[in-house]
Amino acid sequence: MSETSSHDSFYDSLSDVQEEGKSADFFPGLSAFLSQEEINKSLDLARRAIDSSETEDFDSEKEISQIFSKSPISLCETPSHEEPKSGKQTSSERPQDSRRAPVQPLTGDQAERITSPGSKRKPGVSPLLASPSYIRSLRKAEKRGAKNPNPSSKPKTAQQSKAGPQSQLCDKAASFIEELTSIFREAAKPRNRSPNGESSSPDSGYLSPKNQPSALMSASASQSPTADQLDQLEMDAEVKQAQGSLCYQAHQASEETLPLAHIPHPQPQKARHLPTAPRFIQKLRSQEVAEGSRVYLECRVTGNPTPRVRWFCEGKELYNSPDVQIHCESGELHTLVIAEAFEDDTGRYTCLATNPSGSDSTSAEVFIEGASSTDSDSESLSFISKAGAMPQAQKKTTSVSLTIGSSAPKTGVTTAVIQPLSVPVQQAHSATSYLCRPDGTTMGCLLPVFTKELQNTAASEGQVVVLECRVRGAPPLQVQWFRQGSEIQDSPDFRILQKKPRSTAEPEEICTLVIAESFPEDAGIFTCSATNDYGSVTSTAQLVITSANNENCSYDSTGEPNSDHFQHFPPPPPILETGSYELASQKPSEIQQVNSPNLGFSMAALQMQFNTAERETNGVHPSHGVNGLINGKAYGNKSPPTPTALLSPTKEPPPLLAKPKLDPLKLQQLQNQVRLEQEACAWPPAPPGVPCNSSSSGSSAPPSPPFPPPPPAFPELAACASPVPSEPMSALASRATAMQSSGSFNYARPKQFIAAQNLGPASGLPTPTSSPSSSSLPSPLSPTPRPFGRAPGPPFVEPEAMWGPSSPSPPPPPPPVFSPSAAYPVPDVFPLPPPPPPLPSSTSHCASPARFGPSQTPAAFLSALLPSQPPPVAVNALGLPKGVTPAGFPKKSSRTARIASDEEIQGTKDAVIQDLERKLRFKEDLLNNGQPRLTYEERMARRLLGADSANVFNIQEPEETAANQDAGAPRASVGGPLDGQKEYKVSSCEQRLISEIEYRLERSPVDESGDEVQDPDVPVENATAPFFEMKLKHYKIFEGMPVTFTCRVAGNPKPKIYWFKDGKQISPKSDHYTIQRDLDGTCSLHTTASTLDDDGNYTIMAANPQGRVSCTGRLMVQAVNQRGRSPRSPSGHPHARRPRSRSRDSGDENEPIQERFFRPHFLQAPGDLTVQEGKLCRMDCKVSGLPTPDLSWQLDGKPIRPDSAHKMLVRENGVHSLIIEPVTSRDAGIYTCIATNRAGQNSFNLELVVAAKEAHKAPVFMEKLQNTGVADGYPVRLECRVSGVPPPQIFWKKENESLTHSTERVSMHQDNHGYICLLIQGATKEDAGWYTVSAKNEAGIVSCTARLDVYTQWHQQPQTTKPKKVRPSASRYAALSDQGLDIKAAFQPEASPSHLTLNSGLVESEDL
């Protein structure tokens, strides 16, 4: 039941009466244990039951309305189309009401409220916040009415005369309410209970009993006008007309009875001097910021007297300090600023406001993302908006409150919540919300719930595949993975990762399955099962693997495993499937119905009472998802109304008829039919904003209300935003685009393990790997549980198959995707005319949207339109580097990249050229990445634009704040579209290095010489330490290209700026670098031609007396002529990449965390070597780089091949060796070692000199010793000459004694010419004997022996006796052998003394 009527003729709910005459104490009674949705249903059931007896009790209507009416002004008039009896009845009652009005005693405030036109149409927070007193008042309505002091006797008599029927009527209503109350009481008892008795979390979606009384009216004022539309979604016009008068009376009754009991209590809209409890009109917003960034929390609170405001972090009170600054402005705006946030600051921040009348609080999660954090960058986008930009969105309202079961303000879930107002609610209701209280204590919160389901994924063979889901539930959670029903065990091929919750306030686990290298046999249905003590849930997704030789990847066109999820369940849908994907297509009041009793576990008996008309017009069919849709098909012939009230609080859509059901078989037939129609269409481009009706149902949508269509750059998005056959869905998507800049769109995903999903966070389109059934993309573009599919045939495989040169105009390719705030400015930025009425749905080709079939989301269409490798072609889920834009997914660019809007040049040749140019830009990387041929479109564009015209857009990081972009702030990624400057994410290792550099720099002295002249130090008011409004990015460029680092710094006084490269300060007078600083604080460092030496970390440090702050950007300079690269690279072009390896590719830079490229760097390298021929030569080197470099060796420019003499080894410690054994003269020369990886190459040279092997010669006696005789006392010389190479060593021996050293009498001599001499001064008889000389070198040894005889001068030798000359035996020279002399060799015949061999009298003897 709606909170307000969609017709100004009668009250549709008690909320209208509550606004008019109910006092504050009335609210808490029933709302303490009933949610708003449950109360809605309660009232609706009661009305339906009462309606059944309306005919018999019709006569009592007049009586009751007379009794309970309060003010003619406060009552709605009967609509012109109401049934005559109702019209007559109410018209006849008005005069009586007017006469009775003054008689009823009312306080001035009540009268003011009742008659105030401003309060008349304010939607109530709850349609039926009934208390037991209200139930009693219904039962006692007759008595109370009779006792009311009323001077008019006529109405009194009439009332008494019809007391019987009226009593029956009241009893019925009271009975129904009591029955429903008892049902809901147990299911919702602790609802809105938190440790402090409140539930004012910004995204809880509920008002706590403590807050409700004072918050009601303001919340009503800010409530989305879509509450008015809920009536059309729940009831058709006939039901309302029949019930109008009855509701009128019931509301009068409530107004009559309740204020009597509660008049003394203060009213929400009383004059300011009356005390009011605190109420937060602007709540805190959860944030996720990078470490070191500034955290800014703000909220607004009202109350009388002015509330006392206190701040808490994780329950610990915070006080004003230099680190945490707490401010209060104008008594309402309270801010908490953390100048520099660290990981320790992560937690739940609560602002508590108290005064004597009560208290209120608001909480938000602040997550400080550390250097190695793996959470999403873009997650914080939804929280960034300027304070006060949309004050209405900050107020309490349940009309668009969607939570996933917990009061945690930020779950980190990747549920894209497109909200009509930028309410600070970043979560989406799952169907389990009815089980779950904000304090997370009930069974619904204990049960596991997937906050992000698995997404259908397609990948190429060899790519990394990552399947990720997020689950919350009471620990311990056991997560299991299955493929085709078989459990998957953790292994190197299938890594199962599970990230535990980062806080108890946010008990969400990230479960990831990583397939390191995918093969076609890995495809199939993957299931993740989460189990705890309270139950288990599963999430399923399909993985499609295409062969490596396929250029294009077709998604599963049926996706039955996912569509079956909804079709095989009984009416209460499973909690895991009624996910947040339902919500975006619903209006807020519809959203409330997601959690309404027809989904409740305790409402099985009552479910059948909600007829098809009501359930389906609510847009929620238990088995068919939201808006009666499956795969984009609508049930019925009536399109849902456009959310006009999103912008205009007074606009109300026409009633919505019930939608008939469609079975899956019929759906499939319709899908095939639409596909066939699409194949036959040429798809002429339509003006932007023309909604598309791709349904075959033959129905036309109602005219669109006047609110701005999406920006002109998104013709496809404007027209194709909804695969639903309804213009209003397109309008809702348009509305969502217009509202995103205020943070209402939250598509958060983890940094790691998301492959090629960049478009999702930027434009709200589901990504090719997403499955709507996973509830991770609850947007109008993915409202159904089936994955978008491709047609079985060729329709979405190659554009050539869809349109050719004969087509009137090629379909506009996807426009550049901007970050949310830039792409979807607030409505006043683009004051466009309202879109024209939708085309007849039967045409099925009004504008480009109809190009994708009913089972396709626009993202599928976009990915199909671009001929490419499989959409996740740049899959790099592990956060490892990527250098190619994901197929079909343009990189984000700034708005300035668009020269003329599509609207301005639609249908012209310029439009075609511009669109083709865009596509070429997005396809450039793919073309250079091994794609063998150009598509027709690209060939055409190159004819029109020239071959070198397509360039890659720079990447705008998601961290860029909406405020900066909307204000036209300088872009963080500098350089125009012609730059090849690409951003990328640094690894955690690099980040630690960067942090270390910054830490040291901020604590080290700097060179002030080249700094700009600063004003002398003067006292400064509001002095603030420097901080970066825009930080440096990390870039990857090619050698020779220009690069610019840009950031923006602020501080008071104006900070000084210093630049460093790898920790060394860069002089402002440097010739290589140009340093600039603008007046707005933008600082830049530019080099026109980068070299390999420019590779490194660039740090900017800003300093003023308040402190220092630094920021670092990594520059990777890649060599141009590395292996596999084309040496030619057109000017301004990103250089072609060499083909990637099978299992890893170097994908797009805007991935959450990419593979990092580090050029090889030699940590160890040998110098020049000289090696003797025949010896072993070993060259050792050590190299670093990422990926691990490949090493190759060259000799004089020629590759060295491994063979028996040349071996290449790698040791465990990473040392590479080239071993040559033995070395020959051919091995001499210049050796080059080349290390190569994807990031570039490096090399070193050395010279090897091979020393020739010497011609070794054994010693040879050229002159031998001679036998000598000498007279006693005379000197004697024993001489010989020996030669050998190398020169031999000489050893002397006398008999068996070695002569080791010279004495005064006996000395040994040797010269350089080989002459050897033994000189004996004054020979004696003892000197006589055999003397041996030996010569030895490496080649051998030789010896020579001679006899010395000493005789007296007077002794005459007898002539008769022949002297005996004895040759000693070899044994006499055993001592020589001991010295290593080869005695046998020494006594070869040629070595023997000639005089011995010639002497015939020579005899062998052992004795002398």
From Swiss-Prot:
GO biological process: actin cytoskeleton organization; cell migration; epithelial cell morphogenesis; keratinocyte development
Region (Interaction with VASP) residue spans: 569-573, 830-834
Compositionally biased region (Pro residues): 702-714, 780-797, 807-818, 828-840
Post-translational modification comment from the UniProt entry: Phosphorylated predominantly on serines and, to a lesser extent, on tyrosines. Phosphorylation at Ser-1143 by PKB/AKT1 modulates cytoskeletal organization and cell motility.
Residue numbers spanned by region Interaction with EPS8: 782-842
Any GO MF annotation of the entry: actin binding
Subcellular location: Cytoplasm, Cytoskeleton; Cell junction, Focal adhesion; Cytoplasm, Myofibril, Sarcomere, Z line; Cell projection, Ruffle
Intrachain disulfide bonds: 299-351, 469-528, 1181-1233
Pfam families: I-set
Gene3D superfamilies on file: Immunoglobulins (2.60.40.10)
Region annotation (Interaction with SORBS2, SPIN90, SRC and PFN1) ranges: 807-842
Presence of keyword Mitochondrion: no
Gene null: resulting phenotype: Death around 15.5 dpc due to severe neural tube closure defects and herniation of liver and intestine. Palld-deficient mouse embryonic fibroblasts display disorganized actin cytoskeleton, decreased polymerized filament actin, and decreased cell adhesion and compromised cell spreading on various extracellular matrix. Mice embryos lacking Palld exhibit defects in erythropoiesis.
Biased composition annotated in UniProt, kind: Low complexity: 691-701, 765-779, 1123-1133
Modified residues annotated as Phosphothreonine in this record: 642
Subunit structure: Interacts with EPS8. Interacts with LASP1. Interacts with VASP. Interacts with ACTN. Interacts with SORBS2. Interacts with PFN1. Interacts with LPP. Interacts with SPIN90. Interacts with SRC. Interacts with EZR. Interacts with RAI14.
Protein name: Palladin
